[in-house]
Amino acid sequence: MIDELRQKYTLKILLRISGLSKPTYSYYRCEKHLNAVKRRKEEDERILSLILLVFEHHKSRYGYRRIILALKEELADINHKRIQRIMRENSLFGKQPKNKYHSYKGDNGEKKDNLLLHKEVDEESHRTKYVRDFDTSKPNEKWTTDVSEFRCAQGKLYLSPIMDMYDGSIISYDISVSPDFTQTKRMIDKAFKQYPDLKGLIFHSDQGWQYQMKPYQKWLNDKGIRQSFSRKGNCMDNSLMENFFGIMKNEMYYGHKFKTLAELRKAMEEYIIYYNTERISIKRKGLSPLAFRQQSLSQIQLSY
């Protein structure tokens, strides 16, 4: 009560009216402060225990933003700065990119159309600029693919995945010791088996040799799929897939030593399952790629 009235009255007057001595007042004030500190510390420990459950489950892959998203119900009333402070004080930092990664590139062929690139003219400067359009309104409108190399003590593995631009989910993938055309066919066959009706889909890739093979182009054409290519030497035209490779390598590859190809393959397969089913994103409203996809597909079915 005294502390609340100190804005209007001097401490001397308040102590005289209350009958408290200054040492007694100082003692109670100190005790009140210590109790508040104790309660705050206990609450910090409770918050930390929740954070650790998520942080350890996701193998140190989550920074404070994803931690907040994963614990949005448990920590609904907690300020994000407090969570960030607790994680910083306990050295809980999400993995950050440290190494550059390089997608495997086959030999380029002739130039092809980029269906995701649109020209716009600036009204003031009248200059033409190119704008990439990765936006989609529903699943299976735009897919993208690429190949990336993973090394271990025993040799190399190549990952060839297909990603849906709508939700970031990995539709299909193949892991091989050689980035050959057989790998591309296995990947395509898995995707087509899962989704037989893909008429109108835009399927994007770089200008790798495998994507310019006549059989590959016929597979797409027979399904009514429109093929799209990145411009030569422009990795940003396929930045969604490049970003996926970067995230994957940062979270399960860099900093880990794999002795055998079998060990590396197992880690890659487990990560793709984790990425699809557990790795949440702010862009996907706190859902994993497959959870967001299933939600969207369910809404589409209900609308019919």
Residue ranges of predicted features:
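Residue-centric detector for conserved, function-critical "anchor" positions
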Residues: 1-8, 13, 30, 304
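Short, acidic, Ser/Thr-enriched surface-loop or helix-capping motifs
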Residues: 152, 164-165
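Basic, flexible linker segments flanking DNA-binding modules
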Residues: 26-136, 234, 290-297
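Active-site beta-loop-alpha junctions of metal-dependent nucleic acid enzymes
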Residues: 151, 155, 174-196
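Two-metal-ion RNase H-like nuclease active-site motif
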Residues: 141-150
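RNase H-like two-metal-ion nuclease catalytic core shared by retroviral integrases
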Residues: 103-107, 205-207, 213-217, 227-249, ...
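Mobile genetic element proteins and their domesticated derivatives, centered on retroelements
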Residues: 14-15, 25, 51, 67, ...
